[in-house]
């Protein structure tokens, strides 16, 4: 997917990319490739791959969830900024908080935000389980996002404690979602979430299945969750 195909594909979904936004994506790509030589940010470094499998793929969440109606977003395990920073570029009003367990990536994200002129972004080093217990972050965000971080049964315990009641958890997943949703049903219920809907589609020009899962936060998460760091992955709820 080249730049023009990227713009056209988003326009087909009702999303217009301005010249300024296109420049931001271009700079994002250049910095990602440059810094990837210093640290492991992504296995995908060719321009068409980055535009399709990182930028476009991140923004697909906005095809099924209306980011114009929310203000605060927390992205768990964003790595090199996906999905939240491409979403932030497209929806500049958003206040984005990223939590990532690797401090080197936080350094990259701080530099990236400065270079792209992104305002209303904050980057925090640590584990989602720790932030889910922190009163400053717990049940604070309109939307919590995550892309390819863990299976739903684990991901729910990372993300739902951070979403406010009335907010949403939006997960960007790859193939074979049905089994994950079955496994994760108990976790969603225990943690105060209700599955609203899931959407399956393919990336343009590829037979790569993708899924967007939207979970409504209906009830407060019980105080004992999230459990201590590492426990959700070792012993998923359900």
Curated annotation (Swiss-Prot):
Major localization listed first in the record, in broad terms: cytoplasm
Subcellular location: Cytoplasm
Pfam families: GidB (PF02527)
Keyword set includes Transmembrane: no
UniProt entry keywords in alphabetical sequence: Cytoplasm, Methyltransferase, rRNA processing, S-adenosyl-L-methionine, Transferase
Family: Belongs to the methyltransferase superfamily. RNA methyltransferase RsmG family.
Name listed for the protein in its UniProt record: Ribosomal RNA small subunit methyltransferase G
């Amino acid at each position: 997917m080249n730049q023009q195909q990227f713009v056209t594909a988003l326009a087909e979904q009702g999303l217009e990319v301005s010249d300024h936004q296109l420049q931001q994506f271009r700079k994002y790509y250049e910095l990602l490739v440059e810094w990837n030589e210093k640290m492991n940010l992504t296995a995908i470094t060719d321009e068409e791959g980055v535009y399709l499998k990182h930028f476009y793929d991140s923004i697909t969440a906005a095809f099924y969830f209306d980011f114009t109606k929310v203000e605060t977003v927390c992205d768990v395990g964003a790595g090199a900024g996906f999905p939240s920073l491409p979403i932030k570029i497209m929806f500049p009003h958003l206040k984005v908080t990223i939590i990532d367990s690797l401090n080197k990536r936080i350094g990259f994200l701080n530099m990236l935000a400065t270079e792209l002129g992104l305002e209303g972004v904050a980057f925090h080093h640590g584990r989602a389980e720790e932030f889910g217990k922190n009163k400053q972050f717990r049940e604070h965000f309109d939307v919590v996002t995550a892309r390819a971080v863990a299976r739903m049964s684990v991901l729910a315990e990372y993300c739902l404690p951070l979403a406010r009641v009335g907010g949403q958890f939006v997960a960007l997943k790859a193939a074979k979602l049905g089994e994950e949703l079955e496994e994760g049903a108990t976790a969603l219920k225990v943690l105060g979430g209700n599955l609203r809907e899931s959407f399956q589609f393919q990336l343009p020009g590829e037979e790569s299945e993708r899924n967007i899962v939207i979970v409504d936060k209906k009830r407060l998460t019980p105080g004992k969750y999230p459990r201590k760091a590492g426990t959700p992955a070792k012993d998923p709820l359900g």
